[in-house]
Every structure is written in structure tokens, then in C-alpha cells.
């Protein structure tokens, strides 16, 4: 063996021998700030013995002498105790409540003329700000521990996302994916400590920002939130695709204790809003002039949230010589607008927003707005045959004329019947008066019946 190697090995052995005896077999206990830790002290005999707990400065913390146990004058006086029920089993643990990071250090249990050392390491997980934060804000989580400690740290976020193994975790511009429970696992000397921190990102949930509608149909706007216990005020402002150059307010509202109350709203729109979460708006009719972009603003105590929403309206118009389909409002260039007759090939728009067919054939036509084969909007219109289309006005006039003639004839018949009854009644009245004036009446039964029959 090389003499230099032998000397190196001998030097290492001497270093190990010279280490303080108290450090050998030292028990390590990990604790969380604010909770309690139990430091073990086990005697070889399963019976109650005298014992004493001290810190590394030999200050007495807690012990038993004779039949009494008492606490020392340490800074832990109000936060320490022991489990008396375990003393008969030869166990004399030191329980420290409401742990603080400065409580970290070496504690010594003296029992049976021997010293048992326990190293306590207290850690705390702190956040740079409130863990309820707005979308886009930043947050840093920091693991605090005793100076000189170098534990293994592992961070894990929602969806088991793993992060760096440093003592701090930075989350710049938090998003919806960061909302949830974050776990910090601390490992030291085969001991493990787990911290959980729940982060709530106040934001709108992910929903489609564009609503598609056919002209005249009812439209619903929904704005689900990631929270429901914040009081706020809100406003939906709208910029029409063809109209004013500046946005105008459509509706204002407030949310207090989960109840929604409407402030001001445009009367001509006849907007309806749900009285509870999620935020829900109903537009009775989607008209072409309403197509455009809107912005919903929520005012919270922590700041503002914004959500953009677009309304795309499809309109189909027909004339004697053409059929036109168009969409109004903001659309993506990748969308395809097509017009086709059933069971025939499509006629695709070159402008993405308008397609026209001249001299459309009779039958059912479809106008489609699609995105990579997925139909977003569909409108159908029926084109009548040319002969029927030209004859339809005349046929309608004939039908209306016939109905009018029947009504006039019925009125004439009713009037004639009333006149005949009136004339008949007048003749009978005149005949009775004439008979009475000539005194041709009598009291015999057959004459009386005749007179009565005349009346």
C-alpha cells in the first residue's frame, strides 16, 4: 500500500475518534412553526425514574426530582410539558408547543446517568403576499429554518408539477394553472416534513370568448369565476362592429354576499342578468347592429379583472335574383363561410364574411360558418320555384279577393234578413191596430184565439 494513502486513512480515523461523543447517535426531530414537537427520551428500564431536560447552554427546562416535577427558568417555560402517563414505561418526552424557528437547537435529556441528545429543527413556510391574488400578480413562497441547516426541499404544484429544489419558490404572473394546493416537502436525517399552501387565483374561468348567433335568436353570455365569496362591482361596455368609435356601457351591476343587483342598463337591449353566480347575461335578440366586441370589468378590493367577449351574428337575405349570407362581428381569418344547396358542393366565400349566389335554384339552402370542419353557425333558407315565386303575389291577391267577397256576401245576407223581419213585424202591428179600430173583436174562444195568433 502507498505510504501516503496509509497516512491519509489514519488521519481520517483520528478525526472520527476526536469527534464529541454527544454527537454520535443524535436524534433529529423536525417541527413546523406554530405546531408542537415531541422530543423523545427513553430509559433502558420500563419504570418511572428521575430525569432532566436541558438546552445546549445547560439551562434546565423541565425535570423530575423526588415525587415532584417542575419547570426551569428557560424561555420555554410556558410552552413545555411532558407526558406523565408514559413515565411508568420509562419514556420521558419533552413536548414543546407553539413552535418557533428560534426554538431550533440541541436538547439534552439526562436519565440513568446518561445523556441523550436530540436536535430540533423548526421550519416555517411563508408567502410574500396574500395567497388569494389576482390573475397576473406575483407570489414567492419561502422556507425558513435554522441557520446552517441544509435540508432537501422539493416543491410540487397542482397537477403534480415539480419545481426547483431551492428554499424559495417564485411564481411570477400567476395564472389559472397555479391555482390550487402547493406542497413543500422537507427532508433531513431520514425525517420528513410536509407543508401545504393553498393558492387561489382570482380570475375568470377559461371559456370561449366568442359567442355565435343567428339573426333574431336569443343569446346567452356566461362569465364563470374561480371564486364566489368576494364583493365586487362590474360593468359590461360594448363596441359595435359598425357604429360608434368608442365603447358604450350596456349594463352595470354589483355582487354582494353572492347576490347580483343591476344598476344601470340600456333599455332598448332588454338585457336580463342572473341574480346569483355564475354571472349570466341574456340578450333576447341578436341583431346585426349588436355584433362587435365587449369588455366585462370587475372591480375587487385587490384590483380589477377584465374579460373580453365577442358577438358574431349571421344574417341571410334573399331577393328574386340572389341569395346572400354574411357574418358581422370580429372573426378569425381561419374561419370559412360557405353557402350551398343541400346535397351539392359548397360555394366558399373569398372574403370570409360574405358569400352571394346569383339566380339560386329552388330548394333548401344552407349557410355555414366553420372552423377546421367544426360548424359554429348554421342557417337554412328555402328558395321557391320561379313559377311559384312569380305567381305567388297573384295567387295571394285572388285568395284575399275571394275572402273579401265572401265577407261582403255574408254581410248583405244578414242585413237583408234583418230588414225582412222588421217589415214583417210592422205589417202585423198594422193589422192588429186595424182590427181593434173596427171593433171586430169578440169574447168567444175561437175569435180570441184568432186575435191572439195575430199578436
UniProtKB/Swiss-Prot annotation:
Q: Do you know which Gene3D superfamilies this protein is assigned to?
A: Immunoglobulins (2.60.40.10), transmembrane domain of human cd4 (1.20.5.900)
SMART domains named in the record = IG (SM00409), IGv (SM00406)
Q: Which residues carry this modification: Phosphoserine?
A: 430, 437, 453
Q: Where are its TM segments located?
A: 395-415
One Pfam assignment: ig
Cystine links in this protein are 41-109, 325-367
Q: Which residues are glycosylated?
A: 46, 220, 231, 295, 299, 343
* Residue span, Ig-like V-type domain: 26-125
Recount the PTM note. Answer: Palmitoylation and association with LCK contribute to the enrichment of CD4 in lipid rafts. Phosphorylated by PKC; phosphorylation plays an important role for CD4 internalization.
Residue ranges of the region described as Disordered: 145-165
Localization recorded for this chain is: Cell membrane
Membrane-related topology note: Single-pass type I membrane protein
Q: Please report which positions carry a covalently bound lipid of kind S-palmitoyl cysteine.
A: 419
Keywords assigned by UniProt? Answer: Adaptive immunity, Cell membrane, Disulfide bond, Glycoprotein, Immunity, Immunoglobulin domain, Lipoprotein, Membrane, Palmitate, Phosphoprotein, Repeat, Signal, Transmembrane, Transmembrane helix
Query: Where does the record place the Ig-like C2-type domain?
Result: 126-203, 204-314, 315-371
The primary site where this protein sits is membrane
Signal peptide positions (record): 1-25
Provide the function of this protein: Integral membrane glycoprotein that plays an essential role in the immune response and serves multiple functions in responses against both external and internal offenses. In T-cells, functions primarily as a coreceptor for MHC class II molecule:peptide complex. The antigens presented by class II peptides are derived from extracellular proteins while class I peptides are derived from cytosolic proteins. Interacts simultaneously with the T-cell receptor (TCR) and the MHC class II presented by antigen presenting cells (APCs).
Q: How does it assemble?
A: Forms disulfide-linked homodimers at the cell surface. Interacts with LCK. Interacts with PTK2/FAK1. Binds to P4HB/PDI. Interacts with IL16; this interaction induces a CD4-dependent signaling in lymphocytes. Interacts (via Ig-like V-type domain) with MHCII alpha chain (via alpha-2 domain) and beta chain (via beta-2 domain); this interaction increases the affinity of TCR for peptide-MHCII. CD4 oligomerization via Ig-like C2-type 2 and 3 domains appears to be required for stable binding to MHCII and adhesion between T cells and APCs.
> How is this protein named in the record?
T-cell surface glycoprotein CD4
Organism expressing this protein natively: Delphinapterus leucas
Amino acid at each position: 500500500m502507498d505510504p501516503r494513502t496509509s497516512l491519509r486513512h489514519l488521519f481520517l480515523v483520528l478525526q472520527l475518534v476526536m469527534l464529541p461523543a454527544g454527537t454520535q447517535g443524535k436524534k433529529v426531530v423536525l417541527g413546523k412553526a406554530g405546531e408542537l414537537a415531541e422530543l423523545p427520551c427513553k430509559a433502558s428500564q420500563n419504570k418511572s425514574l428521575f430525569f432532566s431536560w436541558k438546552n445546549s447552554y445547560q439551562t434546565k427546562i423541565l425535570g423530575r426530582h423526588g415525587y415532584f416535577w417542575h419547570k426551569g427558568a428557560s424561555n420555554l417555560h410556558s410552552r413545555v410539558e411532558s407526558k406523565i402517563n408514559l413515565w411508568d414505561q420509562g419514556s420521558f418526552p419533552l413536548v414543546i408547543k407553539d413552535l418557533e424557528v428560534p426554538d431550533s437547537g440541541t436538547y439534552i435529556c439526562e436519565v440513568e446517568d446518561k445523556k441523550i441528545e436530540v436536535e430540533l429543527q423548526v421550519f416555517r413556510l411563508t408567502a410574500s403576499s396574500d395567497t388569494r391574488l389576482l390573475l397576473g400578480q406575483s407570489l414567492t413562497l419561502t422556507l425558513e429554518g435554522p441557520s446552517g441547516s441544509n435540508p432537501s426541499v422539493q416543491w410540487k404544484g397542482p397537477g403534480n408539477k415539480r419545481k426547483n429544489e431551492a428554499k424559495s419558490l417564485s411564481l411570477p404572473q400567476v395564472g389559472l394553472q397555479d391555482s390550487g394546493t402547493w406542497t413543500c416537502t422537507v427532508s433531513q436525517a431520514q425525517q420528513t416534513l410536509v407543508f401545504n399552501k393553498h393558492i387561489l387565483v382570482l380570475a375568470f374561468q377559461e371559456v370561449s370568448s366568442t359567442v355565435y348567433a343567428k339573426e333574431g335568436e336569443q343569446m346567452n353570455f356566461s362569465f364563470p369565476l374561480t371564486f364566489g365569496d368576494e364583493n365586487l362591482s362590474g360593468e359590461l361596455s360594448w363596441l359595435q362592429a359598425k357604429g360608434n368609435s368608442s365603447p358604450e356601457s350596456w349594463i352595470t351591476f354589483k355582487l354582494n354576499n353572492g347576490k347580483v343587483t343591476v344598476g344601470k342598463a340600456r333599455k332598448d337591449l332588454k338585457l336580463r342578468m342572473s341574480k346569483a353566480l355564475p354571472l349570466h347575461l341574456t340578450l333576447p335578440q341578436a341583431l346585426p347592429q349588436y355584433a362587435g366586441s365587449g369588455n366585462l370589468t370587475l372591480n375587487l378590493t385587490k384590483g380589477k379583472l377584465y374579460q373580453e367577449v365577442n358577438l358574431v351574428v349571421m344574417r341571410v337575405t334573399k331577393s328574386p335574383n340572389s341569395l346572400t349570407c354574411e357574418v358581422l362581428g370580429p372573426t378569425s381569418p381561419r374561419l370559412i363561410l360557405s353557402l350551398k344547396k343541400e346535397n351539392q358542393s359548397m360555394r366558399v366565400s373569398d372574403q370570409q364574411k360574405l358569400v352571394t349566389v346569383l339566380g339560386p335554384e329552388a330548394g333548401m339552402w344552407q349557410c355555414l360558418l366553420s372552423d377546421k370542419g367544426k360548424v359554429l353557425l348554421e342557417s337554412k333558407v328555402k328558395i321557391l320555384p320561379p313559377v311559384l315565386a312569380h305567381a305567388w303575389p297573384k295567387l295571394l291577391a285572388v285568395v284575399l279577393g275571394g275572402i273579401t267577397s265572401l265577407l261582403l256576401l255574408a254581410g248583405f245576407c244578414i242585413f237583408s234578413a234583418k230588414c225582412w223581419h222588421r217589415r214583417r213585424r210592422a205589417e202585423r202591428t198594422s193589422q192588429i191596430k186595424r182590427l181593434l179600430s173596427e171593433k171586430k173583436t169578440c169574447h168567444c174562444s175561437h175569435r180570441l184565439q184568432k186575435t191572439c195568433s195575430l199578436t
